[in-house]
Each structure stands twice: as C-alpha cells, then as structure tokens.
Design a protein with these regions (language model features):
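Hydrophobic, Leu/Ile/Phe/Ala-enriched alpha-helical segments that form helix-helix packing faces
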Residues: 28, 32-35, 83-91, 142-146, ...
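Short beta-strand or tight-loop elements
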Residues: 105-107
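C-terminal tail/extension regions appended to the core domain(s) of diverse proteins
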Residues: 1-10, 175-189
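Nuclease-adjacent, charged terminal/linker segments that flank catalytic cores
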Residues: 1-55
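Catalytic cores of nucleic-acid endonucleases
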Residues: 123-178
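Conserved catalytic cores of phosphodiester-cleaving nucleases, focusing on short active-site segments
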Residues: 109-129
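Acidic-basic catalytic patches of nuclease active cores, encompassing PD-(D/E)XK
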Residues: 53-100
Length: 189
C-alpha cells in the first residue's frame, strides 16, 4: 500500500514486536474512531454508486480512494489487528509480526518466531456468500506460493461471523498438502 493512500505506512512498514504492535493498533483505531467522513444521503441510486464506489475520499487511515475500497481494506485490517493480537497473547507468542495493511499483493502477514522461523498468513473479512471462495483462494495461495518450500504450517485470519460456515471446511488442496493451516477467527468491532 503506497504511503500516499495509507496514512499509517510508517507505523506498519516493518515487523512489529508486541509493544510496537499495540501502539500501532491504538493509532489505527484512533483513525477509525475520529473519522469525519459521512455518507452523503441521496435517493438517487446512480448518485449513491458514484459516491460510494467512485469518488475519492479520506476515511479512517485511508485517503484518495473510494469509500467502498477503503471500507473493504479497513474490514480486512481489523481482522489482521485482531488476529495479530491473538497470536501475541497465545501460549507461544511470536517475536514479531509483519502486517501488510490494505494489502493487494503478496502475503497479508508474516509471523516471526525464534530461530528464524517464519509462518506466512492470509487474512480476510468476507460476507457469508463469499467466504468459501475467499477461503479457497487463501488456502491455494498459502500452499502453492509459500516461499518456504519446507513450510509445514500457515495461518488464516477470518472474521468470526464466518466460523459456523468455515469450521469444517477443507478444500482438496488442503487435504492433499502436508501443510497444517491454522484458522483463527477474529473480532472486528
């Protein structure tokens, strides 16, 4: 995400330890709670589409992008923040985590453990109608494009509303792979 569109680029550009993460998360959430953007009321559906999907705005930590795009990124970012916090408070917390906020390419996050062990992960915040498709994409990417050919595990962060739908979901690629994919369901509010 370019720094001209994501206002917290500097805070998230490097792997963060727990203290750095908590500070960056606090700052991110301040951008959300102090947001001044308001959806412009209109009964004209064509104008509403223009306002939401086309007009560049500043919303939360994003600027110069449509409200639609910014809200999609914020939704995924909230999953990333919640998932990272769960990892930092887990039984085996990582040393650092690199979060790619508003990511559009590469892996969404990397988890760094002692001994140079890196676990790659994907994150998404999806609606019920799209969650299995997003899960399939995430699994395929983690299995097929993992830069560590010897990787035995990966992580997927998902908005917790999809737990009932995805709890028992396994796709063909995951079943055939030697990789264990850990799913972490995340609060987004």
């Amino acid at each position: 995400m370019s720094k001209d569109k994501f206002l917290l680029h500097e805070e998230f550009k490097n792997p963060l330890n727990k203290a750095e993460f908590l500070e960056a998360k606090k700052l991110y959430l301040e951008f959300i709670t102090k947001n001044e953007y308001e959806i412009k009321a209109t009964k004209d559906i064509f104008q509403l589409i223009q306002n939401i999907k086309r007009s560049p705005e500043k919303i939360g930590p994003y600027q110069i992008m449509s409200v639609f795009e910014a809200l999609n990124r914020i939704g995924s970012d909230l999953v990333l923040l919640s998932g990272a916090e769960k990892l930092f408070t887990s039984e085996i917390p990582p040393e650092k985590i690199l979060l790619r906020m508003g990511n559009t390419q590469g892996f969404d996050f990397e988890v760094f453990y002692k001994g140079d062990k890196v676990i790659y992960g994907e994150a998404f915040n999806a609606a019920e109608s799209f969650c299995k498709h997003k899960m399939r994409q995430a699994i395929d990417k983690l299995v097929d494009k993992n830069p560590d050919e010897k990787a035995t595990s990966a992580i997927i962060f998902i908005n917790e509303e999809m737990k009932g739908i995805l709890e028992k979901y396994k796709n063909k690629k995951e079943k055939q792979s030697q990789m264990v994919i850990h799913t972490i369901y995340c609060k987004t509010n």
